């Protein structure tokens, strides 16, 4: 059986197809919804990674001819690579004198068991932090940076002096020790 389509029937089929775009345009009302994307970044500081080892090795401290503290003592700087704070920060430097670890009694007359020095930490602020182990106050030991920052902190030691005076000799001891501490923290 064969079905034939009359011109009226064909128009009835085509007319709805022709109206589809008009119907779609009539339904263009939209609804928009916004979604907030949020997160947080805490205020934090990290001291970075130490390049090399964490020891300032000065070797023999005295001139073996005179027994007095060597005047040419030096040690390579240490670097804290990639230190950062995500906000305003404080760098605090502290140090302890080098003292004889085995000889703990009071040194006899003419001798000392202490070597003082100055520690510095530079690169974090325009003025390096410094700490003198012989000083009663170290106001330059704390430095404040007003902005977030990332960079290297270079730590060094120098200006060595015998505790009690340069005319004193150091008591024999295979282990003189001091400590330098760098603290990086979020500022109040």
Label each PLM-derived region with a short phrase.
Residues 1-12:
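Bacterial N-terminal signal peptides that target proteins for export
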Residues 5, 84-90, 123, 131, ...:
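Compositionally biased regions
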Residues 11-19:
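Bacterial N-terminal signal peptides
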Residues 21-23:
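N-terminal signal peptide c-region/cleavage motif recognized by signal peptidases
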Residues 25-116, 141-188:
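N-terminal small/polar-rich segments of proteins
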Residues 111-140:
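Terminal beta-strand-rich extracellular "head" domains
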């Amino acid at each position: 059986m064969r079905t034939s389509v009359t011109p009226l029937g064909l128009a009835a089929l085509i007319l709805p197809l022709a109206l589809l775009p008009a119907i779609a345009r009539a339904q263009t009302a939209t609804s928009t919804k916004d979604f907030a994307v949020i997160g947080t970044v805490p205020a934090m500081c990290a001291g970075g990674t130490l390049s090399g080892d964490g020891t300032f090795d000065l070797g023999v401290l005295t001139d073996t001819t005179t027994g007095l503290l060597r005047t040419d003592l030096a040690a390579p700087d240490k670097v804290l690579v990639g230190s950062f704070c995500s906000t305003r920060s404080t760098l605090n430097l502290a140090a302890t004198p080098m003292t004889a670890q085995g000889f703990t009694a009071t040194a006899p007359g003419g001798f000392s068991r202490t070597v003082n020095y100055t520690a510095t930490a530079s690169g974090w602020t325009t003025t390096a932090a410094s700490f003198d182990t012989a000083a009663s106050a170290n106001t330059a030991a704390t430095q404040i940076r007003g902005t977030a920052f990332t960079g290297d902190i270079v730590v060094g030691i120098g200006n060595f002096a015998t505790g009690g005076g340069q005319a004193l000799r150091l008591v024999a001891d295979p282990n003189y020790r001091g400590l330098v501490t760098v603290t990086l923290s979020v500022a109040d």
